[in-house]
Regions:
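Conserved AAA+ ATPase "SRH/arginine-finger" region at the nucleotide-binding site
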Residues: 238, 318-330, 337-351
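Walker B catalytic acidic pair
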Residues: 267-269
């Protein structure tokens, strides 16, 4: 392939147009531009080669490895159409043509590129050579499209936990690594949430879920651990703040056609009687903002059974419809299809949690002594809870508790 063709095919990407915004691919395009300019000045060419290699070497020394990963993770309209079973013949032909070119590009070396440009590569002999290898990109990409329901595409292939910014999901690079195996106690409660999540992943009807209970009982940890546990099965978690509830309908529209399954997670949810966010959540749970997408469920945690902060002012106000208003607010929790209660642990459950955590953290202390000290610690910390148990065990591990 001549240099002009290399450059034209690279700049003429349509399906994989987004690759040109990749910093490494952009530097490669700048290098082919410099070579095609046929400028005999060596310094600008050295600069272009060095800039590309510096960008590539920050990730890997192998162009084929980098480019193949970038191709497989790029979100394209073809993969979206294929996931919906609507890939047209025109798009399929364009996809296969570009994959064939990108496969050749994976095997491109500096010497091959210089030869295509009819340049004397001895002038650049002092520069390092990147590695290259051709892969069967067409087969790999077709497999990725078939697995889109579990592995996803675009940012959803790289990350499984997200927050919301300006109405868009934004990846969390370092999510909480919480594991279900690290959460002793509350197995019956947790299994209800897990079963509902499995139904969501299977494409079966799944409920919106309210995890209610005392602070520190593991409600939020349960949701985060489930997201980690089932990420490989196609589950993604988007955390929505209470002041962002009005953005959920737009998020649902964005995600409805995605082959992955999504939990939109609202942590520590509660409302006051004049809270505008109440109406937004009510509309979402009732489905009055559009049909419920089968691949999305709303999970929320709250320390309040009815999700409402009641004050003396609320009860003695002059609103003629005060009772009806309060009843409507208190009935919001009933609109969740599944409510799971996490109660503060009694002494026996607290002891069982402590024993399991002590094993996980390799605490070498007689259990009787451990329980006595933990009970005293819990009294100072405001009462028994899994969070208090974990804090105590971590202090034992660090040597603070002896």
């Amino acid at each position: 392939m001549q240099l002009r063709e290399w450059n034209a095919r690279l700049h003429g990407l349509v399906v994989f147009r987004a690759l040109l915004g990749d910093p490494v691919v952009a530097k490669l395009a700048a290098l082919t531009d410099r070579l095609e300019a046929a400028d005999d000045t060596i310094a600008p060419l050295c600069d272009a080669v060095a800039a590309f290699e510096a960008a590539l070497f920050a990730h890997t020394t192998n162009l084929g490895d980098y480019l193949s990963n970038a191709v497989l993770e790029t979100e394209t309209f073809c993969v979206r159409q294929a996931a919906a079973g609507q890939l047209s013949p025109v798009m399929e032909a364009a996809l296969n043509s570009e994959l064939s070119f990108l496969q050749k590009l994976c095997g491109l070396t500096l010497d091959t590129l210089l030869e295509a440009a009819d340049r004397q590569n001895r002038e650049l002999a002092f520069l390092p050579r990147w590695e290259a290898r051709q892969l069967d990109l067409t087969a790999a990409y077709n497999q990725r499209m078939r697995e889109a329901g579990k592995k996803g595409y675009g940012m959803f292939a790289k990350h499984h936990v997200f927050t919301v910014e300006n109405g868009q999901l934004v990846p969390v690079k370092y999510p909480d690594p919480q594991k279900l195996s690290e959460l002793p106690g509350y197995e019956k409660e947790r299994e209800k949430v897990i079963a509902n999540t499995r139904a969501l992943l299977a494409g079966s009807p799944a409920n919106n879920v309210l995890l209610y209970g005392d602070a520190g009982t593991g409600k939020s940890s349960t949701v985060k651990a489930i997201a980690n546990e089932y990420a490989a099965d196609g589950l993604r978690l988007g955390e929505v703040k209470k002041n962002q509830l009005y953005q959920i309908p737009d998020l649902m529209d964005q995600l409805a056609a995605n082959p992955l399954k999504f939990i939109l997670f609202i942590d520590d949810l509660s409302f006051s009687s004049n809270d505008d966010n109440f109406a937004a959540l009510k509309a979402i749970l009732e489905g009055s903002v559009g049909g419920r997408a089968r691949n999305i469920a709303v999970y929320a945690t709250s320390n309040r059974r009815h999700l409402i902060k009641e004050t003396l002012t609320d009860r003695t106000g002059d609103d003629i419809h005060e009772a009806d208003t309060r009843q409507e607010l208190m009935s919001l929790s009933a609109r969740f299809g599944l409510t799971v209660t996490f109660q503060r642990p009694e002494k026996a459950r607290f002891a069982a949690i402590l024993e399991e955590l002590a094993k996980q953290h390799h605490i070498q202390m007689p259990m009787e002594e451990l329980l006595v000290k933990a009970e005293a610690f819990a009294i100072r910390a405001g009462g028994r809870s899994p969070r208090v148990a974990k804090q105590f065990i971590e202090q034992c591990e660090s040597g603070v508790q002896k």
